[in-house]
Design a protein with these regions (language model features):
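Extracellular/secretory-pathway and virion-surface proteins
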Residues: 1-100, 108-110, 117-122, 133-136, ...
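Beta-strand signatures of extracellular beta-sandwich domains
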Residues: 6-8, 142-146, 235-239, 299
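Solvent-exposed strand-loop boundary residues in beta-sheet-rich modules
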Residues: 11-13, 147-151, 193-195, 242-244, ...
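Solvent-exposed serine/threonine-rich low-complexity stretches and specific carbohydrate-binding patches
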Residues: 16-28, 152-165, 171-173, 247-254, ...
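Short coil/turn segments at secondary-structure boundaries
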Residues: 20-21, 142-143, 285
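Loop and turn regions of beta-sandwich accessory domains that flank beta-strands and are enriched
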Residues: 27-52, 57-59, 73, 208-328
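Surface-exposed, short loops/turns at beta-strand junctions within beta-sandwich domains
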Residues: 58-61, 175-182, 264-265
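Extracellular/luminal regions of secreted and cell-surface proteins that mediate adhesion/ECM remodeling
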Residues: 70-218
Length: 329
């Protein structure tokens, strides 16, 4: 259960946050067992959440201060042996070396990193994590981005980033022509608040593009549903990157087989299969599998019933797959 955690400084609650993590889209899957269940600040195999906050405005050099840590009271004792494990670090530093200094931390899309595998491969909107590491608040950023040997795109972002604040910025769709020959994608912050960044060493970042699977113009989604009412938890949608939906479905029947014919023109598409209970379509896993219903099945097949892509049933919250109809750009 989500609980509030508090830092108390000089007997005053100065910072609070919720400790709870959605594990249904854990990139490390399938694992077996209870891995999709939400947890207090962690998911099996992934990094523990961090909470960072600034103390500068609360203290003066040479001052003695007191710290205390408080957690919202737990009223549900069904997990009476549960405990919190935590560590705390205090960092002190001098004034920033630069006024205008934006760090490009990481590219989320497109990326070949395992940590972003749930939302890649994709040729959709690029997303980048940025951090203000200069003393000047950032209100405007000019981005240049695209394939290194391809056509560049430009985007002017407006917002507000204070010192040490992070943000995830989505960039408009870019031109992918030449992807077949060059899979290197870059994002560069050209100007900050209309002027050059004072530290250019962290203004450009490169990722490797994984090309989505190419599918035929006509293919079949084969779905075998669970029983015990779990089929009602499932739905699917096929759309393009402009948000236009071409196929969707829900309200499936238990213990049923569906062959859904898909016919699409050349283009870039996204398939998402949802499970509202975030436990996939596998049998409920870790104990007495044969007594808890049947396992579902999901896959793409060509019109001659040959498999194109078979998805694991133990997927947690959703299956997401971007794909190409027609030639690779």
């Amino acid at each position: 259960v989500s609980k509030s955690h508090y830092f108390i400084i000089n007997e005053s609650k100065e910072h609070s946050w919720k400790v709870w993590k959605d594990c249904g889209n854990n990139p490390i899957y399938p694992q077996g067992g209870t891995w999709p269940y939400d947890r207090a600040g962690w998911c099996p195999g992934t990094r523990v959440d961090e909470e960072v906050f600034e103390l500068t405005y609360l203290v003066n050099p040479g001052q003695t201060i007191t710290f205390d840590y408080e957690i919202e009271k737990m009223s549900d004792n069904t997990e009476e042996n549960g405990i919190y494990r935590m560590s705390h670090q205090l960092f002190s530093f001098g004034p920033p070396n630069f006024k205008r200094n934006l760090e490009l931390v990481d590219i989320i899309n497109p990326s070949s990193k395992d940590s972003y595998s749930r939302i890649n491969p994709t040729l959709g909107k690029a997303r980048v994590i940025v951090k203000n590491v200069g003393s000047e608040n950032i209100r405007r950023i000019k981005f240049l981005y695209g394939l290194i040997s391809g056509k560049m795109s430009t985007f002017h972002w407006r917002g507000y980033l204070k010192f040490l604040e992070k943000s995830i910025i989505s960039l408009p769709l870019n031109d992918w022509h030449g992807l077949k020959d060059d899979k290197r994608f870059f994002i560069e912050a050209v100007t900050i608040n209309g002027r050059k960044d004072e530290d250019y060493t962290d203004n450009k970042i490169i990722s490797e593009v994984q090309i989505p699977q190419v599918l035929p113009e006509s293919f079949v989604i084969k779905l075998k549903t669970n029983n015990y009412g779990r089929s009602r938890q499932n739905s699917y949608n096929i759309s393009d990157y402009n948000g236009n939906s071409f196929y969707s479905g829900s309200d499936f029947l238990d213990s049923s087989n569906y062959d859904i014919l898909i016919q699409l023109e050349n283009g870039l598409y996204r398939f998402v299969f949802y499970d509202s209970n975030e436990d996939g379509i596998d049998r409920l896993w870790w104990k007495e599998k044969d007594s808890v219903g049947i396992s579902g099945e999901l896959g793409f097949y060509d019109v001659e019933q040959n498999p194109l892509k078979v998805f694991p049933p133990d997927f947690g919250q959703e299956i997401r797959m971007d794909f190409i109809i027609g030639p690779i750009p």
